[in-house]
């Protein structure tokens, strides 16, 4: 039997599910009567998603469709970091939506501090964009998970690598 148990706190998403959500959004834009002639383009890169469209109103409609498709595919809406709306020549607008992946160092420190303050028998260590939590008791680890689920963080948290 292991002397200590641990798990990792990560913030990640399924890339293929995001690709599918963007693809479904594009199909709905082409099929919807109010968006059909807007010449809306979605461009997905590793850095983020760029939306090119005719107006800010259309941009808001596309964002709503994207959020619906992402939610149906079990993607957290917290992965989207909406940038400013920019003019793209003529009356067209564009917006870059950055994709959040990994736990930022400030947030990792905040999570680690919360764990240290509330759970004396649990150790938390920051390893890059992952927080490793370890303890001698599985019950303590489950209490940490329950406590973190009650918090509202700007990134979605997943608990992986149970040992």
Swiss-Prot record:
GO CC annotations on file: cytosol
InterPro entries linked to this entry: DUF520, UPF0234-like_C, UPF0234_N, YajQ-like_sf
A GO molecular function annotation here is: nucleotide binding
Q: Which UniProt keywords apply?
A: Nucleotide-binding
CDD domains, sorted? YajQ_like (cd11740)
- The reply on keyword Transmembrane helix is no
Question: HAMAP family recorded for this chain?
Answer: YajQ
PANTHER family attached to this UniProt entry: UPF0234 PROTEIN YAJQ (PTHR30476:SF0)
Annotated function: Nucleotide-binding protein.
Similarity section: Belongs to the YajQ family.
Annotated NCBIfam families = PRK05412.1
Q: What is this protein called?
A: Nucleotide-binding protein tll0793
Q: Which organism is it from?
A: Thermosynechococcus vestitus (strain NIES-2133 / IAM M-273 / BP-1)
């Amino acid at each position: 039997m292991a002397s200590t148990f641990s798990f990792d706190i990560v913030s990640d998403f399924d890339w293929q599910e995001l690709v599918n959500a963007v693809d479904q959004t594009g199909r709905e834009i082409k099929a919807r009567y109010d968006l059909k002639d807007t010449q809306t383009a979605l461009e997905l890169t590793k850095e983020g998603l760029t939306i090119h469209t005719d107006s800010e109103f259309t941009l808001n409609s596309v964002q709503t469709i994207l959020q619906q498709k992402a939610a149906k595919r079990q993607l957290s809406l917290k992965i989207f970091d909406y940038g400013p709306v920019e003019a793209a020549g003529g009356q067209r607008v564009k917006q870059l939506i950055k994709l959040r992946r990994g736990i930022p160092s400030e947030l990792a420190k905040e999570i680690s501090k919360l764990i240290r303050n509330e759970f004396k028998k649990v150790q938390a260590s920051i390893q890059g964009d992952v927080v490793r939590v370890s303890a001698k008791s599985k019950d303590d680890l489950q209490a940490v998970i329950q406590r973190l689920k009650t918090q509202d963080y700007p990134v979605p948290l997943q608990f992986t690598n149970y040992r």
